[in-house]
Design a protein with these regions (language model features):
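Catalytic-core region of carbohydrate-active enzymes that cleave or remodel glycosidic bonds
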Residues: 1-39
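Catalytic domains of carbohydrate-active enzymes that cleave complex glycans
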Residues: 15-16, 31-120
Length: 120
């Protein structure tokens, strides 16, 4: 869920981008062995040969979609002067804090936040 979490964090910090260092830095046999020296298995790529996807990529896509939804919601809530709902959204975004990850897993934070924005 870290791929989705980072997009929510970007929304919280009002960032307009995210740099992912590797998209397809494949090993010799990426479909058989995704280990890459000192990095975790699969960490060096989000797409596999032949256009295959992976959970890391799917989570990143979900996060990007949430980021865009948050951006649109913020604009609409400001335009409609729905300050109470906007404050609730800001409080949800505040839960995306690196130190919070020590206590609450990323997937739990993302799931709660998705429930909130999908209910608006």
């Amino acid at each position: 869920a870290e791929g989705a979490w980072i997009a929510w964090y970007a929304a919280k910090e009002n960032l307009d981008g995210y740099l992912r260092w590797a998209l397809n830095s494949w090993t010799i046999e990426p479909l058989l062995d995704s280990r890459f020296y000192t990095w975790g298995a699969g960490d060096t790529y989000l797409l596999y040969p032949g256009g295959r996807t992976c959970l890391r990529f799917e989570n990143l896509v979900a996060g990007i979609q949430a980021y865009e939804k948050i951006r649109i919601l913020k604009t609409e809530l400001q335009t409609q002067n729905k300050t109470a709902t906007l404050r609730k959204l800001e409080r949800v975004l505040e839960s995306f804090d690196e130190l919070q990850l020590l206590k609450t897993p990323a997937n739990v934070v993302v799931e709660k936040a998705n429930l909130f924005i999908n209910g608006l």
